[in-house]
């Protein structure tokens, strides 16, 4: 435990350096990278946050595992051994540095650091557990959606997104905007007030279609799993403001990527209508109610960024070419 406290802080410093480089590159190339590509790069880096919790192997162990995993040959054997030895040497140097510095720091300092970190982890875990209980309570109070028109619209959206699995849709009085929840058993929860507004003619089927397409794309791209990873990282890195900013940014990139995925399904003439749906329901869909759910919501700054993304969105060239070929084939 004494060694872990310093190694964890050392890894945090190294991670922050690489994170700063990643954020700088993404800002530099923001006009060249699509919203989906930026989001995928963030997901890859999100996995890196697991590294501090893995033990560092010693050189002989790394080399022996390398020989087991990669068949040896006379020509490649020396190169393989040299490469693995070099990597193991570097890892061992980092390991030795962490151990040597940690031994110079009084034990009670290490214990104090671990104690305060553990308190923060416990508090964050309690908050996450409370959110999970809220989602469970939401499901207990929800009922299967009975509105036939919206159910038909939902089935059309499933077909439009090429989703073959059956995803149950429920109605609830405790939400202001639709959300997707559940990783093993995903469900969409639809607010009753939107159903009432639809029946009264206050909102139209197009608005509901956009909302449903948005939630279904969250499901299609496994955003629930990414959400769990983000919340887990939040628990263990609660003290690191740069990583906190990074995790908040991933959530925003997730919505931008989801918007872009929806826009790829729509005609260019519908982009403005999709943006208007976000603007018209900006107050209603102020925030996603629970950290463990996916929704179309966001704060004012995030909604502004999403509107700008919609305004500047252009379908990838291969998508436009595919649509032209489809039209030509239909004409023939």
Identify the role of each PLM range:
Residues 25, 29, 33, 217, ...:
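Juxtamembrane interface helices immediately C-terminal to a transmembrane segment
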Residues 2-5, 31, 94-130, 268, ...:
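Cytosolic-facing loops and C-terminal tails of multi-pass membrane proteins
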Residues 55, 145-156, 160-164, 220-221, ...:
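Short helix/loop segments within enzyme catalytic domains
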Residues 206-230, 255-259:
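Active-site recognition of the HExxH zinc-binding catalytic motif
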Residues 32-34, 56, 97-202:
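Juxtamembrane/interface helices at transmembrane-helix boundaries
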Residues 49, 54, 188, 229-244:
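Hydrophobic, aromatic-rich membrane-embedded alpha-helical segments
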Residues 1-123, 140, 159-166, 303:
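Hydrophobic membrane-embedded segments
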């Amino acid at each position: 435990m004494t060694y872990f406290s310093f190694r964890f802080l050392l890894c945090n410093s190294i991670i922050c350096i690489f994170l700063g480089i990643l954020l700088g590159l993404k800002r530099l190339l923001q006009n060249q990278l699509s919203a989906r590509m930026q989001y995928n790069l963030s997901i890859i880096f999100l996995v890196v946050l697991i590294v501090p919790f893995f033990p560092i192997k010693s050189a002989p162990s790394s080399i022996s595992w390398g020989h087991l995993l990669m068949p040896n040959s006379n020509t490649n054997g020396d190169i393989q051994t040299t490469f693995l030895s070099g990597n193991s040497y570097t890892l061992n140097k980092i390991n030795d540095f962490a151990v040597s510095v940690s031994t110079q720091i009084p034990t009670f300092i290490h214990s104090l650091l671990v104690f305060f970190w553990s308190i923060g982890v416990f508090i964050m875990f309690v908050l996450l557990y409370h959110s999970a209980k809220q989602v469970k309570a939401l499901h207990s109070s929800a009922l299967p959606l009975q509105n036939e028109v919206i159910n038909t619209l939902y089935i059309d959206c499933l077909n439009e997104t090429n989703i073959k699995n059956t995803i149950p849709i429920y109605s609830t009085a405790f939400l202001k905007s639709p959300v997707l929840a559940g990783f093993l058993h995903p469900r969409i929860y639809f607010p009753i007030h939107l159903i009432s507004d639809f029946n009264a003619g206050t909102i139209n089927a197009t608005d509901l279609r956009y909302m449903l397409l948005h939630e279904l794309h969250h499901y299609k791209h496994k955003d629930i799993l990414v959400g769990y990873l983000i919340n887990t990282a939040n628990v263990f890195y609660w003290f690191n403001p740069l990583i906190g900013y990074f995790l908040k940014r991933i959530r925003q990139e997730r919505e931008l990527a989801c918007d872009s995925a929806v826009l790829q399904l729509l005609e260019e003439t519908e982009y403005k209508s999709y943006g208007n749906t976000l603007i018209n329901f900006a107050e209603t869909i102020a925030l996603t109610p629970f950290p463990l759910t996916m929704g179309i919501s966001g704060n004012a700054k995030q909604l502004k960024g999403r509107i700008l993304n919609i305004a500047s969105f252009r379908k990838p060239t291969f998508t436009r070419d595919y649509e032209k070929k489809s039209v030509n084939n239909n004409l023939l």
